[in-house]
From Swiss-Prot:
Subunit-structure text: Homodimer.
SUPFAM superfamilies: lambda repressor-like DNA-binding domains, Periplasmic binding protein-like I
Keywords of the record: DNA-binding, Purine biosynthesis, Repressor, Transcription, Transcription regulation
Domain of life: Bacteria
Native source species: Aliivibrio fischeri (strain MJ11) (Vibrio fischeri)
PROSITE patterns: HTH_LACI_1, HTH_LACI_2
Portion annotated as DNA-binding: 4-23, 48-56
Protein's GO biological process: negative regulation of DNA-templated transcription; purine nucleotide biosynthetic process
The protein, known as: HTH-type transcriptional repressor PurR
Protein function: Is the main repressor of the genes involved in the de novo synthesis of purine nucleotides, regulating purB, purC, purEK, purF, purHD, purL, purMN and guaBA expression. PurR is allosterically activated to bind its cognate DNA by binding the purine corepressors, hypoxanthine or guanine, thereby effecting transcription repression.
Chain residues that bind hypoxanthine: F73, K189, T191, F220, D276
Length: 337
């Protein structure tokens, strides 16, 4: 493996000059830079990240704890994170914990050993055990990208779930639906509680009541939505909901599939609105009306906030709030026409 001395010898310069060219720490004549970079390429030289981190007190690496990397919503956020890290010259260590506390402990310890410059935490719900773990690493610049309890010591991304739940339900009501069911995620998750509050507030603003038995608990996965639709379809047709609000697009896809398998039509018989606006939602059959969240922008913003925190650890706490909006496609019938 080539060393910095090999590069210096081939380029006919000192090792100090090679270091300045690679790290861009001092002016070096263009012709000299050209010789150095040609030598680097010819020798396939890779600077020691360990040596550089000891000298500069930075590794130009960021750690990211993720609980559900397979979920399309989180995958799109992660794309925004990775893309912006790359553009800024940072390497991303992505650790998928799947909500396992032992994995979380292991990865936090590993990232600390790697001396990452900062940490992003993206969780489907931030539980107290993970919060306690994170609070033991308060010296590490950190951005929480979660939908759980607040922490005054970290920057945070908020998804504004209550407003999203309100907008989804309001859209259904404005299209003439007064009998609306919803399929939530796990009832104990903060994001679900907030979307239910939005669902209830939209009904109250329209002076409408709702059947609490039509708030059906899912888990953000297809199978739970399919079971929930079975319950809806077991209701006598004349008393059945005309619209269904699913708390993510994956459950909406499963709901549409189940409804169509039963011989009913979407949206003619039952309308469906989703949440997240994942890339696939535009290609559902029918294309899904949903609540948009700026996922890749959220990923980019999280990295921007973290890099500012790395530069200035005493910077005042930042909170970025996503603004949900309705994306109208073809899965909701206007019953007023």
């Amino acid at each position: 493996m080539a060393t910095i001395k090999d590069v210096a010898k081939l380029a006919a310069v000192s090792t100090t000059t090679v270091s300045h060219v690679i790290n861009k720490t001092r002016f070096v004549a263009e012709a000299t830079q050209k010789r150095v970079w040609e030598a680097v390429e010819e020798l396939n030289y890779a600077p020691s990240a360990v040596a550089r981190s000891l000298k500069c007190n930075t590794t130009r690496t960021i750690g990211m704890l993720v609980t559900q990397s397979f979920n399309p919503f989180f995958a799109e956020v992660m794309h925004g994170v990775e893309n912006y890290c790359y553009k800024q010259g940072y390497t991303l260590f992505m650790c998928n914990t799947e909500g396992d506390l032992e994995k979380q402990k292991h990865y936090l310890r590993m990232l600390a050993e790697k001396r990452v410059d900062g940490l992003l935490v993206m969780c489907s719900d931030l539980n107290e055990q993970l919060l306690t773990l994170l609070e033991k690493n308060t010296e590490l610049p950190m951005v929480i990208m979660d939908w759980g309890p607040d922490s005054p010591r970290t920057d945070k991304i908020i998804d504004n779930s209550e407003e999203g739940g309100y907008l989804a339900t309001k859209h259904l009501i404005e299209n003439g639906h007064t009998h609306i069911a919803c399929i939530t995620g796990q009832a104990d998750k903060v994001t679900c509680k907030e979307r239910v509050r939005g669902f209830e507030r939209a009904h109250a603003d329209a002076n409408l009541s709702f059947n609490p038995e039509w708030i059906l608990e899912g888990d953000f996965e297809c199978a739970s939505a399919s079971k929930a639709v079975d319950k809806i379809l077991s209701i006598e047709e004349s008393k059945r909901p005309t619209a269904l609000f699913c708390f993510n697009d994956i459950m909406a896809l499963a709901a549409i599939s189940k409804i169509q398998q039963s011989g009913l039509r979407v949206p003619e018989d039952i309308s469906v609105i989703g949440y997240d606006n994942i890339e696939l939602s535009a290609y559902f059959s029918p294309p899904l009306t949903t609540i948009h969240q700026p996922k890749r922008r959220v990923g980019k913003t999280a990295v921007e906030i973290l890099l500012e925190r790395i530069k200035d650890k005493d910077h005042e706490r930042r909170v970025f709030e996503m603004q949900p909006e309705v994306v109208t496609r073809s899965s909701v019938l206007n019953r007023l026409k």
